[in-house]
A protein has these predicted regions:
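N-proximal low-complexity "stem/linker" segments adjacent to membrane-targeting elements
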Residues: 306-330
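A recurrent flexible, glycine/aromatic-enriched loop bordering the glycosyltransferase active site
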Residues: 75-80, 434-452, 468
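A short, conserved acidic/glycine-rich loop-to-beta-strand motif
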Residues: 42-50, 413-423
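Short beta-strand-to-loop acidic/aromatic patch adjacent to the donor-nucleotide binding site
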Residues: 16-27, 386-397
Length: 528
């Protein structure tokens, strides 16, 4: 290839300023001529460096399925980008090497580089055979045994062909050469030795990190090694070190994945294993941001979120002290319960709870006239930022780990905004847009007596002018308006007794309050 390029040089006219060596699978960016003409023409620059996009993570395709080159340049996702070096003056350089050919200065010239704004984009034909590369590289090494660059490329090509022993020996030869002084390429020789030498993998990766500590690739490979053997502290350290390096630079050795999802994924997994759950959550989100369609990364988010997710429980109470004690004892057995806020209607109810002394249980009284929605909002104001909020009546029986199951469902599916345990005999989950209203036969909607609101929606407040019912419907409407689902899940169950407090309200008075609430609710809904 070097001889062929030199033959082309000899065929060119003498009265030209620049030679752009452009392969058939490369495209010049718009405005290339103006960028090149802006380079000083005073003899101070004989090699113009430019931005070279070598590959693409995402292409834009035409309707017939072919690659839309201009569309990809405008809207595609570049992969490896580095500074190209194949634009030279007419007589300053010649080519050498049979393959992976390079420009070298001719006698009487010195290397004088300068930057320009020109861009070249590579659209590789991945179906093209590489079969000629290895014989040509072996020939280059034979003819130029002191050329460290050729030895490196030959060792790499041997690795691609699975000729492990020869490849490792060639990489070690590269490291021993007096001319092998460029740290990044030396480190990559160590990296590829590690890749092909499982028993010595850690040793060579550590040497590579020491040789080239400012490059991400070696640190990420070291983190991957520690992940593979379950050394979570090592994985955490190496991935953190990789992510601390924020200057990608413009070397041809950089790999897009090292600046994408992979180091964040490794750090998230290691942090999760070490119990550093907030860090796991942060970097899990970052990994997913780089690869939003990766199912494994998406699935991992459940574990990171669930490790830190907790629920605060809000229970209004007045007379049903026995029921309250029962449900509080059930809640205290559930590891996902963070705080239990008991909102007492009056001093008598508050005083009767002196025997509940667990630190998770906070007993409070509201001031002024008591109603259920005022109590719910009081609990909202007390709840911990970032926690889901579980609204619970004091006349409900919960199955074992009910809160944990509800929290898990919210963490697993971000589309759920409001969830309640199954309270009928049905076994399947149901998405609903209304409330229970005393229907326990499988046709009822969201249970106002046991419903959990997702943590990111807890800025909501119930309308306190509604005294008893229809506030639940207001909440359901709010969740649906936010584009979220209201789910009755069969993964958790509860049994609801008829409210002791409501049963003490005379039927006529109850009907009057409910009808008044309905009028106010309808009026508010029309206003929305």
């Amino acid at each position: 290839f070097g001889n062929a390029r030199n033959h082309l040089l000899d065929l060119l006219p003498n009265d030209i300023d620049w030679i752009i060596n452009l392969d058939v699978d490369e495209v010049l960016g718009d405005g290339w001529r103006a960028h090149l003409e802006a380079v000083p023409n005073d003899g101070s620059v004989n090699r113009a460096r430019y931005t070279y996009t070598w590959n693409w993570e995402e292409y834009i395709h035409s309707e017939d399925g072919s690659i839309d080159i201009q569309g990809t340049i405008a809207r595609g996702k570049p992969g490896l980008i580095y500074q190209g070096d194949k634009i030279t003056r007419r007589f300053s350089h010649r080519w050498m090497n049979a393959v992976h050919e390079v420009n070298i200065t001719q006698s009487g010239h010195q290397e004088l580089q300068g930057q320009c704004g020109l861009r070249i984009y590579h659209f590789a034909d991945n179906t093209k055979s590489r079969s000629s590369y290895l014989p040509l590289l072996l020939l280059d090494v034979e003819e130029n045994p002191d050329n460290d660059r050729n030895v490196y490329y030959c060792a790499r090509e041997l690795m691609f062909y699975g000729r492990t022993q020869e490849s490792v020996e060639m990489f070690k030869r590269h490291l021993l050469m007096p001319s092998s002084v460029w740290a990044p390429e030396r480190a990559f020789s160590m990296r590829y030795i590690a890749k092909q030498s499982p028993e010595e993998r850690e040793k060579w990766l550590l040497r590579g990190c020491g040789e080239y500590p400012w490059g991400r690739e070696l640190w990420v490979d070291l983190a991957q090694h520690y992940y593979d053997i379950g050394n979570w502290e090592g994985c955490y350290f190496a991935a953190s070190r990789a992510l601390s390096l924020t200057n990608r630079g413009d070397l041809y050795l950089t790999e897009a994945v090292m600046w994408g999802w992979l180091p964040h994924d490794l750090l998230a997994i290691a942090a999760h294993r070490l119990g550093r759950h907030q860090i796991a959550l942060e970097h899990g989100y970052k990994a997913l941001g780089h690869a939003p369609h990766d199912k494994r990364l998406s699935d991992n988010m459940f574990f990171y979120k669930n490790a830190v997710s907790m629920a605060d429980v809000v229970i209004p109470t007045k007379d049903n002290i026995a029921g309250l004690r029962r449900v509080v004892n059930q809640l205290l057995q559930d590891q996902k319960v963070d705080n239990i806020f008991v909102i007492c209607d009056g001093q008598e109810a508050f005083d009767r709870l002196d025997d509940i002394n667990d630190k998770k249980v906070k007993k409070v009284m509201t001031s002024g006239e008591f109603n259920i929605h005022k109590a719910w909002n009081f609990g909202f104001n007390l709840s911990k930022t970032g926690n889901h909020v579980f609204f619970l009546n004091d006349d409900v029986y919960l199955n074992e780990n009910c809160v944990s199951h509800l929290v898990a469902e919210l963490d697993r599916d971000d589309s759920i905004g409001l969830i309640c345990p199954q309270y009928s005999a049905l076994a399947q989950d149901r998405v609903v847009t209304d409330t229970c209203r005393g229907r326990y036969d499988g046709t009822g909607g969201m249970a106002g007596f046991a419903m959990m609101l997702a943590s990111d929606l807890t800025d909501y407040r119930f309308p306190e002018e509604l005294q008893l019912w229809w506030g639940d419907d207001h909440l359901v409407d709010h969740v649906v308006d936010k584009g979220r689902k209201c789910l009755i899940t069969s993964k958790a169950r509860c049994v609801h007794e008829h409210s002791v407090t409501i049963n003490k309200v005379p039927n006529d008075e109850l009907a009057r309050i409910v009808n008044l609430d309905k009028e106010k609710y309808d009026q508010q809904k029309r206003a929305r």
